[in-house]
A protein has these predicted regions:
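Glycine-rich oxoanion-binding loops at beta->alpha junctions
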Residues: 106-107, 112-121
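Active-site acidic carboxylates
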Residues: 1-108
Length: 121
């Protein structure tokens, strides 16, 4: 039986979710340069999806990985956490550099940005 795609993605119960599409993950400032190079081809596609979702009234939600200035809630049980800790020394003021969305995607005023302070995705 064919799936009714229009009903499946109706704006009333659908959202576009991006996860960690941030400068320090897939951008020029990435601590994972191989990942950033591999992601260059998907950034325009994500941006196109986000524009289409907004135009259709579908919420766009950006899940970001962030740290508090005091690093409370931050894990240290993976090598990736040690690498990201160097980006934001304990007590550094202002937003975490990893919280900046990739410039090719960005957040529009109506988008939701949902920070995550611990764990890996």
């Amino acid at each position: 039986m064919p799936v009714d795609l229009a009903a499946l993605v109706a704006p009333g119960h659908t959202a576009l979710l991006t996860v960690e599409v941030q400068d320090n993950v897939i951008g020029d400032a990435s601590i994972l340069p191989d990942l950033a190079r591999a992601a260059t081809t998907i950034v325009p596609n994500i941006a196109t999806l986000a524009r289409a979702a907004r135009a259709a009234g579908v919420p766009v939600v950006h899940g970001t990985a962030e740290t508090r200035p005091d690093r409370l809630g931050s894990n240290n049980n993976a090598r990736l956490f040690a690498a990201t800790a160097k980006l934001r020394p304990r007590g550094a003021p202002g937003p975490a550099p990893t919280a900046v969305l990739h410039a090719g995607i960005g957040a529009e005023p109506g988008d939701l940005v949902m920070p995550r302070l611990h764990g890996l995705s």
